Amino acid sequence: MGDRNLTPKQFGALGEQYAAAWLEEHGWTTLSRNWHTRYGELDIVMLNPEYTVVFVEVKSRRSMHYGYPQEAITPAKQHNLRKAACDWLLDRRNRVPHSAVRFDVVTIVLRVGRPLVHHIENAF
């Protein structure tokens, strides 16, 4: 999984794909992937088993040399993700019965062998 020949965009997409599959294995349902707004992109929108709509920001790295992946989610990025999430919730095509909304972060270190996954619930 840690193929050095991937472009940064391909590497990020691989991390998002792995995160979605990992969450689906835990009973979550994918509602949207790579949803674009004027505020940026929502990586993954999922419905968890408790009927919470979860906006999942995925950060992938090849190593921990540059710090924790979640450190890349600045307050400004969080602000834009909240605005994008509001747009997603207001879009009629995204109507889904839910009991709550939250923001999670999934970090993935794609290394040789098995990727290291860390799921941070209610990250911000």
Curated annotation (Swiss-Prot):
MF-aspect GO terms: nucleic acid binding
Xref: Pfam families: UPF0102
InterPro entries: Restrct_endonuc-II-like, tRNA_endonuc-like_dom_sf, UPF0102_YraN-like
Domain of life of the source: Bacteria
HAMAP family for the chain: UPF0102
Family (UniProt): Belongs to the UPF0102 family.
Record's protein name: UPF0102 protein BL0935
